[in-house]
From Swiss-Prot:
SUPFAM superfamilies: Sigma2 domain of RNA polymerase sigma factors, Sigma3 and sigma4 domains of RNA polymerase sigma factors. Residues 72-92 are annotated as: Disordered. Residues 312-365 are annotated as: Sigma-70 factor domain-4. It is found in: Cytoplasm. Residues 338-357 bind DNA. One of its GO terms (cellular component) is cytoplasm. Its main location: cytoplasm. Belongs to the sigma-70 factor family. RpoD/SigA subfamily. This is RNA polymerase sigma factor SigA. Pfam families: Sigma70_r1_1, Sigma70_r1_2, Sigma70_r2, Sigma70_r3, Sigma70_r4. Keywords: Cytoplasm, DNA-binding, Sigma factor, Transcription, Transcription regulation.
Length: 377
């Protein structure tokens, strides 16, 4: 079973160190690629508001954040006609394809077809809607959100198979999209898709961390696990075999110990009711040793000891027998103090001590003790 006490791994660099590296890189080139920023900062549990502050800081330093290779939007625009009109026959199987083996049911298919009919926006349209939103135009909010629903789907499909239904991933991503619509500031010079992507990814990864696993894993650790999985798959293709922890560590630039710990955290809990065997007539729990259970031999010896002890106690007076039963918890496993036993019999604790001492002397007599000695060896 997975341990619910996870030690949060320290990254090779702190968040501030990574940001300093990005700033240094941006100063040399006067710009930074949005994709590079996302990749470097994704292992950290950054709120979108914190990302906004970082982007503003980059702008103050004269570093432009570019999004020249915006794959999300360029792929989505393939669903439109060249004249800019929306295509009623939007091919969601091509644009929003899922990993092999993942099927979509009718509600999802209907949803994808519906959002495929919503025309995408030009950069000028986005700016115009953003201005209206800043003036409190609710219709502009709705229009900007609807035009980017396909962006949510294209991001959500990357997280299929991680413990949440595809439709649930889309729903969580849509919540992030709504947040992005409310907070988007066109004056910063970002395309809306650039800004919204972080909010959408953040909403989905947080939902997976909170809901997908029996044992919750911190968001930043979910990102680290995802990166390890990607590296493992890449090495599997290159090497033609499963990579070793040492090979993964070298590729991720982490220590082997950290990679092993990440792999341990990534393990899913297994139910004790998991069927085992071809007939499914056994369960995993049947094959796990109960460390507290007695062996058959010990159980038999324990039953014999109980029988002999009952016979020996029968040779005492009723009061002596009951005092010993209460003092040593022979019936219910709970021992009582002299004072507690005294209250039961309505006598002083000193009187109970005397009765107990007398009863124990009787039990030590060879005529009685020899019947129990064999069980003490």
């Amino acid at each position: 079973m997975a341990n619910d006490q996870h030690t949060e791994l320290e990254t090779e660099f702190t968040l501030d160190q990574v940001k300093d590296q990005l700033i240094e890189q941006g100063k040399k080139r006067s710009s930074l690629n949005y994709k590079d920023i996302m990749e470097k900062l994704s292992p950290f549990d950054q709120d979108p508001e914190q990302m906004d502050e970082f982007y503003e800081h980059l702008g103050d330093l004269g570093i432009e954040v570019v999004n020249e290779n915006d794959e999300e939007v360029s792929n989505l625009r393939q669903g439109e006609d060249h004249d800019g009109n929306d295509n009623d026959d939007f091919n969601f199987d091509d644009d929003l394809s899922l990993p092999p083996g993942i099927k979509i049911n009718d509600p999802v298919r209907m949803y994808l077809k519906e959002i495929g009919r919503v025309p995408l926006l030009s950069a000028d349209d986005e700016v115009e809607l953003a201005k209206r939103i800043m003036n409190g135009d609710e219709e502009a909010k709705r229009r900007l959100a609807e035009a980017n629903l396909r962006l949510v789907v294209s991001i959500a499909k990357r997280y299929v198979g991680r413990g949440m239904l595809f439709l649930d991933l889309i729903q969580e991503g849509n919540m992030g999209l709504i947040k992005a619509v409310e907070k988007f500031d066109h004056n910063k010079g970002f395309k809306f898709s650039t800004y919204a992507t972080w909010w959408i990814r953040q909403a989905i990864t947080r939902a997976i961390a909170d809901q997908a696993r029996t044992i919750r894993i911190p968001v930043h650790m979910v990102e680290t696990i995802n990166k390890l999985i990607r590296v493992s798959r890449q090495l599997l293709q290159e090497l033609g075999r499963e990579p070793t922890p040492e090979e993964i560590a070298a590729e991720m630039e982490l220590s082997v110990e950290k990679v092993r710990e990440i792999m341990k955290i990534a393990q899913e809990p297994v139910s004790l009711e998991t069927p085992i065997g071809e007939e499914d007539d056994s369960h995993l729990g049947d094959f796990i040793e109960d460390q507290e259970a007695l062996t058959p031999a010990d159980a038999a010896a324990y039953e014999l000891l109980k029988e002999q002890l009952e016979d020996v106690l029968d040779t005492l007076t009723e009061r002596e027998e009951n005092v010993l039963r209460l003092r040593f918890g022979l019936d219910d496993g709970r021992t009582r103090t002299l004072e507690e036993v005294g209250k039961v019999f309505g006598v002083t604790r000193e009187r109970i001590r005397q009765i107990e001492a007398k009863a124990l002397r009787k039990l030590r007599h060879p005529s009685r003790s020899k019947r129990l000695k064999d069980f003490l060896e």
